[in-house]
């Protein structure tokens, strides 16, 4: 709708240029948000849903149950809840196997509700909490953490805890008072992958394997249109090493 731009830009060419730029940025934001949702689903939902890919939906668990640990009493003042977390991390090492465990560079806990509150304020572990800056992450969750300063994060004994209570798209996978323990892996291990593909909407453009493809086309009357397509497939190769639990 060029009418809204023509009030500020009397020159029609200028108005069309600004409109195209605005639509281009809006398209990119929309597609980036969609990619982030699918990365979360691959990492914490352990699947990829697809309406168009020839292989259909991908279940990284291949029908198996996800790895869980017993509920943890984060309100306990007699038994340190962090001991249960360390036990869960050891279970994660078993699921990874010795080869991949050696390539683990860190651990991130996505926690919500009572789990997040308990990890940050339980008196038995409060002296272990050291508030830090943005969590360092790699692979799939680089986009989720590093580019989202809204996430509250802190450190407990070398483990990064991220409070995601206010992010329903993540809480939907871990539960309102749940948590997920995710290993941060060396990129060379290729445990988390984001494959990019070619575009299909244009006969000549978009033939490189990149995440986003965007084209500017004009109709017979030279009115421009912005076309954006995103071709990607996130892959989680260590779904059993993502440990899930909840607050008791």
Regions found by a protein language model. Name each.
Residues 1-65, 80, 84, 90-110, ...:
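Long, contiguous amphipathic alpha-helices that act as assembly "spine/axial" helices in icosahedral shell
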Residues 4-7, 27-28, 33-39, 43, ...:
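Non-transmembrane, interaction-prone segments in cytosolic or luminal domains
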Residues 6, 13, 24, 30, ...:
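Generic serine detector
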Residues 46, 56-59, 72, 117, ...:
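Flexible, active-site-adjacent loop/turn segments at secondary-structure boundaries
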Residues 63-75:
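Amphipathic alpha-helical segments that form coiled-coils or helix-hairpins used
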Residues 73, 79-172:
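A contiguous, surface-oriented mixed alpha/beta subdomain in the mid-to-C-terminal portion of proteins
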Residues 126-248:
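Sequence/fold signature of self-assembling virion shell proteins
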